[in-house]
Design a protein with these regions (language model features):
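Catalytic domains of riboflavin
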Residues: 1-3
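Hydrophobic helix-and-loop "lid/oligomerization" segment in the mid-to-C-terminal part
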Residues: 7-135, 155-156, 173-176, 182, ...
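Mid-to-C-terminal polyanion-binding domains and interfaces
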Residues: 70-74, 316-322, 326-359, 411-585
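Short, glycine-/Ser/Thr-/acidic-enriched flexible segments
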Residues: 85, 142-144, 166, 191-192, ...
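Short helix/loop capping segments that flank catalytic or ligand/cofactor-binding pockets
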Residues: 89-90, 147, 170, 245, ...
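Conserved beta-strand positions in the Rossmann-like core of class I SAM-dependent methyltransferases
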Residues: 107, 160, 538
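Active-site cavity-forming subdomains of large catalytic enzyme subunits
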Residues: 126-204, 208-217, 227
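Short, well-ordered strand-loop elements centered on a beta-strand within folded domains, enriched
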Residues: 175-178, 183-186, 391-399, 522-526, ...
């Protein structure tokens, strides 16, 4: 059962509203997102390129770009080594195009998810050595590649690291000892000594900051680097970074540019998904376009996605984009099968575990993270999904707020051949013989309580469903872009009746309702969740007959509470308010 609670953060909402020309409702919503003080509020509402932080504040950024300038002037061969997800693809694109623009002799390599696994490895290093590569620059990986970078250095190569992942460490007697590779320069805002004001950049944003400095040193107008902002925004949302502070500005500015994008690949991907560039929002990055990019790295090679953005021929770009859309459709089908298998395993034997470890040897290893996310959502427990690979077992984990997944993996790192990640997500490789040992140890170390497993729904503001009007709903758009750490406002109302409920949609998976308030006002509502579960919930609570009456549009005794977001429904030139139900009781 979910636990609903109202966020109560105090402020002079009337004063804020007056100073910024907004409603007290919007002022409260901004405060609920942790934004305090006039300067921070102004930055939240209107922050633009001028408010971005100085890239030179990134530790080693000056040194790394000095090395690049020297290598470019000497025409040394440079290779970008990225990653196979959306952030890795966009990071690689930015570095490759940026270094090329500066006159560098540069190529790129993206690891094969199945053969290479995550990030730089000895195989890729030896390939680079055989190709006469002088300098390797990583993006969205490299911070944990201590041994691999030592190998590259032993072969005489220069190694530059740009990354955003957690810094690896060992722990002795409660004290952390952070590891650092032999790389010639490392740019990662998470380094302890780095004074960069914002630590939550994605890999593509770090790469872009490097290119900004490189352009300046190569006498290229820094404004040219703004062309990459659509890629940075795409990666920031696609890699599920917090949409706070600088990330909020990066995504906002990137969305402006994508609405008029001239990149044939980006336009083709948008059009193949039956959208227009001016329609694109952060939602489309995360749930429509992004999965197409990730599908190439999961089922084929991420080079397909990268080549899409490098493509200058419109017809060819359209063909590649169509291939990516098809791959994503295949991925969806395979994911559904994997989720079903995983839930069976959980229900048959793992329900008592605080941390779920699901071993699915025959499931495609690239789908482990998605499946883990779905199981985490269903069970509200930290979840690892492991699959069989060529060299042992690989897996991905997805966590809940109370559980820092990367820190917990550090407690049993001796079991892994490789691991890394964030508080909310992680990846790991281990011998098959260690799977059960891992299951036991990760649970033995777990300090979660029963309270931690209860999903918590944070309500921004209680508000009657008939209160929001069109001007207020339009004003709420000031809070965009929405995403992690800047979710759509969660508004709640209670004691609502159901005048009518109708199941619609091609797959009969959308519920349209007419709700009635205690004051007799009617409001249109829509619910995109599990319709059968909705019926069963109210059937248990009020009886199946009452539910049947509601679906027939007849008088019934059902009363419901909802968490919702108001939207404008446009139909045949008319506008009306419709609420989108997120949760119900």
């Amino acid at each position: 059962m979910e636990k609903w609670f109202v966020i109560n953060k105090g402020a002079d909402f009337a004063g804020i509203a007056k100073r910024f020309g907004i409603s007290p409702v919007t002022a409260r919503l901004i405060r609920n997102r942790g934004v305090m003080g006039d300067e921070a509020i102004a930055r939240y509402l209107k922050g633009g390129i001028g408010e971005l932080y100085d890239p030179y504040l990134l530790l080693d950024s000056d040194r790394l770009t000095d090395i690049l300038v020297q290598k470019i002037s000497e025409q040394k061969k440079i290779r970008v080594i990225g990653d196979y997800d959306i952030d890795g693809v966009m990071s690689t694109y930015i570095l490759y195009k940026g270094i090329t623009r500066c006159g560098g002799s540069v190529d790129f390599q993206i690891p094969d998810r199945m053969k290479d696994g995550y990030g730089i490895n000895d195989h890729l290093i030896e390939q680079a050595d055989e190709a006469g590569i002088d300098t390797i620059i990583t993006c969205d990986n490299g911070i944990a590649a201590i041994g691999e970078i030592a190998h590259a250095k032993s072969l005489g190569m220069t190694v530059l690291v740009t990354d955003h992942h957690e810094i690896p460490y060992t722990e002795e007697r409660g004290e952390r000892h952070y590891k650092r590779s032999e790389a010639d320069a490392i740019v990662n805002p998470k380094q302890m000594e780095c004074t960069y004001p914002y630590k939550n950049l994605c890999g593509a944003a770090v790469a872009w900051k490097v290119i900004q400095i490189l352009y300046e040193k190569c006498d290229i107008a820094v404004e040219e680097s703004y062309d990459f902002l659509e890629n940075v925004a795409f990666a920031t949302v696609g890699d599920v970074m917090d949409l706070t502070d600088e990330n909020r500005i990066l995504v906002r500015e990137g969305l402006k540019r994508i609405h008029t994008t001239m990149n044939p690949g980006m336009r083709a991907l948008i059009l193949q998904n039956k959208l227009e560039p001016e329609q694109i929002s952060s939602y489309h990055f995360g749930f429509v376009l992004g999965p197409c990019i990730n599908a190439s790295g999961r089922l084929e090679t991420a080079k397909i996605a990268l080549n899409l953005f490098l493509q200058e021929d419109v017809k060819k770009a359209s063909e590649i984009a169509a291939e990516l859309v098809d791959l994503n459709a295949q991925r969806k089908d395979m994911t559904a099968e994997g989720v079903e298998l995983a839930m069976q395993q959980v229900e048959e034997g793992n329900t008592g575990e605080k941390v779920l470890v699901v071993y699915l040897p025959d499931v495609h290893e690239s789908l482990a993270g998605i499946i883990a996310g779905r199981i985490r959502e269903a069970c509200h427990k930290p979840t690892f999904v492991l699959t069989k690979s060529e060299d042992g077992v690989k897996g991905s984990g997805r966590s809940i707020e109370a559980y820092s997944m990367y820190e917990e993996l550090c407690k049993c790192q001796e079991l892994f051949t490789k691991f890394g990640g964030h508080p909310m997500a992680a990846g790991l490789s281990l011998p098959e013989a260690n799977v059960e040992i891992f299951r036991e140890k990760i649970n033995a170390c777990c300090g979660l309580t029963e309270e931690d497993f209860i999903p918590k729904i944070k309500i921004d503001i209680p508000m009657p469903v008939d209160y929001p009007d069109i001007p207020l709903v339009n004003e709420l758009l000031l809070l965009e872009p929405f995403g992690k750490a800047n979710v759509k406002p969660q508004i709640a109302d209670k004691n609502l009746g159901i005048d009518r409920a109708v199941v619609v949609g091609k797959n009969q998976n959308v519920l349209k309702l007419t709700l009635k308030t205690e004051r007799g006002k009617s409001i249109s509502a829509v619910y995109f969740g599990d319709v059968e579960e909705f019926r069963e919930y109210y059937g248990r609570k009020y009886g199946e007959n009452e539910v049947q009456q509601a679906f027939l549009g007849r008088t019934n005794g059902i009363r419901m509470s909802v968490v919702y977001y108001p939207e404008i429904n446009r139909y045949q030139g008319n506008e009306s308010i419709q609420i989108v139900i997120k949760n119900y009781q």
